[in-house]
Amino acid sequence: MNKIFKVLFMLSALSLLCFAQAKQTTTITKDIVELNENGAGKKVGTVTVTETANGTSISVEATGLKVDAGQVGLHLYEKNSPKPTKDKSGNLVIGGGLGEDMGDLGSLTVNGDGSVSQTIVGELEYSDIKGKSLVITDDVNSYADNTQTKKEPLYVAIF
């Protein structure tokens, strides 16, 4: 009988240890806003970042996007300020405060009514996004044919 209690105790201790080491699910939701000459404009939707032990999902829900139906890019930008800046010539750069594009996270499909409801799963962690911005751009990178076009930030979620 004493052996049974020892085995049960060991199994209980192991299960507690495994549970304590399991990665907690982290979910953060931020507003997606339109970028304009004043910085952040009207809200068009939300982006939810969920980090689990199996990876990170980025769920985009938006309506009223002012782009043609089809593909747009979702990118990670280095800063979290939607404020416009000026270039060397003094021209206004909408979204200039976002800094540099740090990477393409995938493409989103915009419906004919300007809506998006899509989830992208990647290997990012929330710590990779914190203090930065998720940006919807008007173009997607085409790595298959080695072409990259100029991407204009249109909508942003500040983290």
Which residue stretches match the model-derived regions?
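Bacterial N-terminal signal peptides that target proteins for export
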Residues: M1-F9
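Short, linear, compositionally biased motifs with a strong N-terminal bias
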Residues: L11-L14
